[in-house]
């Protein structure tokens, strides 16, 4: 006879497993590029057609400007913005778009002009590219707390009610940033740790004080420093700079965060900061495109439109299986937009609008098509389709197949730099003016 108590336990366990998986994959988009940091959504009903008036659940203005992407947990949507010199943390309601709270965390200026003085002095402080400002790092949440980071190094943790739990400044604590085009790396949350990366000009070729690139972890609840690891590379000057966010990789026996920048791809233990492996000599200059993973292979672009390289990782250890890259591809590679992988294929978009599809295993190019416009937003993979959004707010959707097929072109009518977020079959896009939720309106 079946034990009813045991049956209840088994049923409860099954429900918990299903619920946990559903909440994590379909409801929440907790960080930049989503739950796995790879811009892949499990949604089956994400819209493919919309306009500035059609198939829009809501559209709300966002004060100021920013390049950060929204993060989502349940009915909470978080974003950052810079309004003049005010650095703002914002919370919106997912179903209505209502701005639930706005917190001025600090003030700062996105300096555009280099420092004048002796040769090399302009490298001793950061300046910002005209396309972005201090609100470039995206927020991250674990469902209880949310972390905001700004380009001047201001780091703050709040609860969902908007109470600030702790604040600190990376430049004040760790030294002045020497990043050529403005700090933009997004933070991560791993267990009870907030992990930040700073990759910057070492100033090694100049006389005087030097600068370090580093990873640093803080307790999520208290802001207490837990570990700090210097990230050493052989890069020089601007080549040291990297604006990328690490990506998680969970091998059978090892969880690691993988970073591209400083002409180097490497991995670290997120619990301790220990470096696990590195690949040097990936020369290409300063790096904006972050790595992505598809089927135990890391794909990364070597700096400014450098080769796209594929590094195979062992399924158990997570270590590279070979000294050299499995393959590399050099034509029309991206300078800003991250690769995205799905179903054994890799998709990239160059800054000037060449969309391409490659075989993830051997680098075979299946198609290379110019789809129009200039791009900074990273593409999204969802339900057998790839979403490419250009600076003018035109989203071109293509089939994620070996044959180039355009599904739709959608016009938002506002400029877009930020990468999209997905939750409950709705697409959230942050434009230069607004936050837009694309999909069927929610019922009251």
Question: Where do the model's predicted regions map?
Answer:
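Ala/Thr-enriched low-complexity intrinsically disordered regions
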Residues: 4, 19-22
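Bacterial N-terminal signal peptides that target proteins for export
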Residues: 1-10
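Bacterial N-terminal signal peptides
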Residues: 9-19
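Noncatalytic, solvent-exposed loop/strand surfaces
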Residues: 21-444
């Amino acid at each position: 006879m079946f034990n009813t108590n045991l049956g209840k336990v088994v049923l409860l366990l099954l429900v918990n497993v299903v619920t946990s998986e559903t909440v994590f994959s379909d409801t929440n988009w907790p960080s930049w590029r989503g739950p796995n940091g790879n811009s892949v959504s499990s949604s089956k009903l994400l819209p493919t057609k919309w306009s500035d008036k059609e198939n829009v659940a809501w559209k709300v203005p966002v004060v100021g400007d920013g390049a950060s992407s929204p993060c989502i947990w349940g009915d909470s949507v978080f974003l950052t913005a810079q309004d003049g010199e005010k650095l703002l943390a914002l919370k919106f309601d997912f179903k209505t778009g209502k701005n639930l709270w706005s917190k001025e965390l600090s003030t700062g200026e996105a300096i555009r002009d280099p420092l004048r003085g002796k040769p090399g002095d302009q490298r001793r402080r950061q300046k910002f590219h005209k396309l972005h400002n201090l609100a470039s790092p995206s927020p991250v949440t674990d469902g209880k707390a949310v972390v905001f980071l700004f380009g001047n190094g201001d780091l703050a943790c709040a609860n969902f009610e908007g109470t600030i739990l702790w604040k600190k400044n990376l430049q004040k604590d760790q030294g002045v940033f020497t990043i050529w085009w403005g700090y933009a790396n997004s933070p991560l949350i791993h267990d009870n740790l907030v992990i930040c990366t700073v990759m910057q000009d070492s100033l090694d070729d100049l006389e005087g004080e030097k600068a370090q690139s580093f990873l640093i972890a803080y307790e999520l609840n208290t802001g207490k420093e837990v570990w700090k690891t210097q990230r050493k590379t052989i890069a020089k000057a601007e080549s040291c700079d990297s604006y990328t966010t690490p990506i998680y990789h969970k091998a059978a026996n090892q969880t690691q965060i993988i970073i591209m920048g400083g002409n180097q791809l490497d991995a670290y233990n997120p619990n301790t900061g220990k470096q696990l492996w590195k690949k040097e000599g990936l020369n290409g200059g300063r790096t904006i495109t972050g790595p992505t993973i598809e089927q135990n292979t890391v794909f990364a672009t070597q700096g400014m439109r450098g080769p796209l390289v594929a590094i195979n990782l062992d399924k158990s250890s997570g270590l590279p299986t070979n000294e050299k890259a499995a393959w590399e591809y050099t034509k029309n590679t991206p300078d800003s937009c991250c690769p995205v992988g799905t179903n054994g294929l890799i998709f990239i978009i160059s800054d000037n609008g060449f969309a391409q599809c490659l075989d993830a295993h051997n680098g075979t190019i299946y198609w290379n098509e110019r789809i129009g416009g200039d791009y900074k937003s990273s593409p999204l993979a969802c339900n057998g389709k790839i979403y490419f959004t250009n600076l003018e707010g035109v989203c071109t959707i293509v089939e994620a197949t070996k044959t180039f097929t355009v599904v739709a072109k959608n016009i938002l009518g506002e400029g877009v730099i930020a990468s999209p977020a997905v939750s409950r079959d709705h697409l959230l896009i942050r434009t230069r003016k607004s936050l837009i939720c694309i999909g069927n309106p929610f019922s009251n």
